[in-house]
């Protein structure tokens, strides 16, 4: 208990500052602070090529003396095996120019600081666990639905890794070709969940960006159907206490209620849990940290390496 009290005091002290990098496929967000209520500076910029983008991050962080550690919540796939020669590297990403890019090593060498790294969704999950919608939970999922789909899982109070890290966006869900003849947009699998339900897939299927589709458009029923199919699988496999859904596509207010309703229907009464059947509005929720979940997750990753 004394250690936990010491750790809590240290992590929440305004004198202990950490660097945080939310490394996304379209933008990077850099911040320095100690928690949600103590962000000293923040900067965001477009993701270009690795040398330029990493250079801008380093220039930002090098303005601050006395940082204790740096956390990186990054798009992937990532090599997260500590014993691997390519630990902390982006591997087989479809993001042009970023294949086999060292992230953790580049920042550690340049700054001489400990670096914590994980996927963007695992980082956001950690942030929600520390400060947001998953506080006091041991088992939950964090999903992001945007230009890609990713998921982070907490099981028994720990982020799930394993051989690699979960790729929840690349599971297969039933695809009714008669109702939805769209072939899918995933360059690896075609009509996996990511290929059917990202913002990119919606734009290619319907010929316009998701945010421009009206509330009553059939796109939203179909989107909710695919997402609920995935959630039903996750519920049956991982039995989470809560599911948090973020990302640009989920910012459309009509979508979350549709997903909840379809999830309850798809489970068919088999999972007899009042949390789902009677309180779905508290079971499938939006991130409490909103758009800050990623960068605050990176901050939590920095704190975790001390």
Language-model features, listed with the residues they occupy:
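ATP-binding/phosphotransfer module of carbohydrate and carboxylate kinases, centering on a glycine-rich
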Residues: 1-69, 78-86, 105-113, 127-137, ...
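Short clusters of small/polar residues that mark proteolytic maturation junctions
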Residues: 43-44, 95, 164
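Conserved phosphate/oxyanion-binding catalytic-loop motifs
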Residues: 72
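Conserved NAD(P)H cofactor-binding loop of Rossmann-fold oxidoreductase domains
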Residues: 75
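A charged helix-plus-loop insertion that forms the helical arch/lid used to bind
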Residues: 84-99
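General beta-strand structural signal in soluble alpha/beta enzymes
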Residues: 115-119
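Short alpha-helical segments enriched in small residues
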Residues: 122
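Glycine-rich phosphate-binding loop of actin/hexokinase-like ATP-binding domains
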Residues: 135-194
């Amino acid at each position: 208990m004394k250690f936990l009290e010491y750790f809590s005091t240290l992590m929440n002290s305004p004198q202990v500052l950490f660097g945080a990098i939310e490394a996304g496929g379209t933008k990077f967000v850099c911040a320095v602070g100690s928690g949600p209520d103590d962000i000293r500076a923040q900067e965001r910029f477009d993701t270009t090529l690795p040398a330029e983008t990493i250079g801008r991050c380093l220039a930002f962080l090098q303005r601050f003396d006395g940082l204790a550690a740096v956390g990186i919540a990054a798009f992937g796939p990532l090599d997260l095996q500590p014993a691997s020669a390519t630990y902390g590297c982006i591997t087989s990403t479809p993001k042009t120019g970023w294949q086999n890019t060292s992230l953790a090593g580049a920042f550690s060498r340049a700054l001489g600081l400990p670096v914590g790294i994980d996927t963007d969704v695992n980082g956001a999950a950690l942030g929600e666990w520390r400060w947001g919608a998953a506080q006091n939970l041991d088992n939950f999922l964090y999903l992001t639905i945007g230009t890609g789909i990713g998921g982070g899982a907490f099981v028994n109070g720990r982020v799930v890794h394993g051989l690699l890290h979960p790729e929840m966006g690349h599971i297969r869900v039933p695809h009714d070709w008669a109702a939805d003849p769209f072939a899918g947009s995933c360059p690896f699998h075609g009509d996996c969940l990511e290929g059917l339900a990202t913002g990119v897939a919606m734009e290619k299927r319907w010929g316009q960006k998701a945010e421009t589709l009206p509330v009553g458009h059939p796109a939203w029923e179909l989107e909710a159907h695919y997402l609920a199919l995935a959630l039903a699988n996750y519920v049956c496999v991982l039995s989470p206490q809560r599911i948090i859904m973020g990302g640009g596509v989920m910012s459309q207010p009509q979508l979350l209620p549709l997903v909840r309703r379809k999830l309850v229907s798809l489970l068919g009464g088999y999972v007899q849990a009042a949390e789902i059947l009677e309180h779905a509005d508290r079971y499938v929720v939006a991130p409490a940290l909103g758009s800050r979940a990623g960068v605050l997750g990176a901050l939590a990753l920095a704190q975790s390496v001390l």
